[in-house]
Amino acid sequence: MAEEANSAAREDLAGLGYEQAREELVATVQRLEAGGLSLEDSLALWERGEALAAHCQAKLDGARARLDAAVAAREED
């Protein structure tokens, strides 16, 4: 069951660009910091935040790889 939820969350994030995911991550952190949520809601938000952070990092890693490849190709010429 947890694996199905994780898979659904990954699919949900797949369509988000870096900026969208980062904005949602910031909003998620703000909601958590504001408090007043139930334990279950807090955990769900925390899990979403972790998934968003990983998605953002993957986007940044991909951008870095593209830049590195472009620089390497330019240096070969």
What are these regions (language model features)?
Residues 1-9:
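N-terminal leader/presequence segments that are low-structure
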Residues 13-74:
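Amphipathic, hydrophobic secondary-structure cores in small proteins
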